[in-house]
């Protein structure tokens, strides 16, 4: 099995060598005599050997990205069956045990069809970061490739995708004075006040967050107050200018109205499949204030169980928040220029392009 150290080395080689393939022809054309041209040719050939070595060590990956309810899981399953692959899930909610229906986690029967990784890693009262995901997923990619199978990354958590492919900048530790300041704001004035303060300091960040998303609002305030830099700027900063892996990324592009209707229908299906019972069981063990239980859908179901939301209002709120989330996902992934967007019925085209990519 190829070691992680080798993979890290090949990533470094890959990033060092790629510029030579961009600049090589121009530089060769600038040589003034034959001897210089020979030296230049040898120089480029040597780097080509190193580049080839790095790519042999570093496995190819297929990525299935895009917004919620767009059919990522079904497409990824089809690709895994077609290309002898294993699925590496990239969803920040599917890492939680006991949270299955509301996270649209693949069912046990589906998981038996092809191997799935990065599911059911922690309990709802535990934490899991994008950095930890990147390390764990890298290790799994290495093992899947060693089995001569295709690693297929599937999910809609853009930060996980970016952390794995490009790395993420480490956010400096938050000084206690800033943490106390933000906590004091929240204790004295509440979440809505903090959200309005975030609108002043980080307008773009505030727009992306629900006004009741206490944990993320406070975190965003801590970061911008202590560093002068928004949380999004840290998340979008790429330590690696080029991706750490060779990958081919696809996403399914639906008409917005159609996608929104899929979201609405899926909400009903989840509720009919026992989502209420799932949440009731969670509440026997965990506080409703836990971050995962404040996620889209779970919070609304809890409010319904607490008689704070009638059934119809609960359904509408889940649908609305999910549509808003899908819109944010679309915005995120649209900024990733290396994702190929396809119509839902273009499956044959997707398969053909992946075949070409894998045969290179």
Mark where each language-model region is.
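Short hydrophobic targeting helices and cationic amphipathic motifs
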Residues: 4, 9, 15, 21, ...
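Phosphate/pyrophosphate-binding catalytic cores of soluble transferases and nucleic-acid-acting enzymes
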Residues: 43-360
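Residues in and immediately flanking transmembrane alpha helices
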Residues: 12-15, 20, 36, 85, ...
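Polybasic, low-complexity intrinsically disordered segments
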Residues: 21-43
């Amino acid at each position: 099995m190829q070691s992680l150290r080798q993979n890290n080395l090949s990533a470094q080689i890959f990033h060092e060598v790629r510029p030579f393939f961009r600049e090589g022809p121009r530089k060769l054309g600038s040589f003034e005599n034959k001897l210089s041209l020979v030296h230049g040719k040898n120089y480029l050939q040597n780097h080509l050997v190193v580049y080839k070595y790095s790519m042999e060590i570093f496995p190819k990956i297929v990525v299935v990205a895009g917004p919620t309810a767009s059919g990522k899981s079904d497409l990824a399953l089809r690709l895994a069956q077609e290309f002898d692959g294993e699925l590496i899930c990239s969803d920040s909610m599917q890492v939680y045990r006991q949270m299955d229906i509301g996270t649209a986690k693949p069912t046990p029967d589906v998981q038996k069809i092809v191997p799935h990784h990065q599911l059911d890693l922690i309990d709802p009262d535990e934490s899991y970061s994008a950095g930890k995901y990147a390390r764990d997923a890298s290790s799994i990619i290495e093992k899947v490739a060693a089995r001569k199978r295709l690693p297929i990354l599937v999910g809609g958590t853009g930060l996980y995708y970016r952390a794995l492919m490009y790395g993420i900048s480490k956010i400096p530790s938050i000084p206690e004075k800033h943490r106390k300041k933000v906590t004091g704001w929240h204790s004295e004035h509440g979440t809505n006040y903090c959200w309005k303060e975030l609108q002043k300091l980080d307008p773009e960040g505030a727009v992306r967050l629900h006004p009741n998303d206490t944990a993320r609002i406070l975190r965003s305030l801590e970061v911008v107050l202590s560093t002068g830099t928004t949380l999004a700027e840290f998340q979008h900063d790429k330590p690696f200018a080029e991706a750490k892996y060779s990958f081919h990324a696809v996403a399914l592009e639906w008409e917005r109205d159609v996608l929104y209707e899929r979201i609405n229908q899926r909400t009903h299906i989840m509720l009919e499949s026992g989502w209420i019972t799932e949440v009731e069981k969670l509440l026997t063990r965990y506080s409703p204030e836990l971050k995962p239980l404040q996620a889209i859908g779970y919070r609304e179901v809890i409010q319904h169980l607490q008689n704070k939301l009638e059934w119809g209002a609960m359904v509408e709120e889940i649908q609305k928040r999910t549509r808003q989330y899908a819109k944010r996902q679309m915005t995120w992934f649209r900024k990733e220029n290396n994702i190929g967007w396809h119509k839902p019925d273009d499956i044959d085209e997707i398969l053909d392009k992946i075949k070409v990519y894998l045969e290179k």
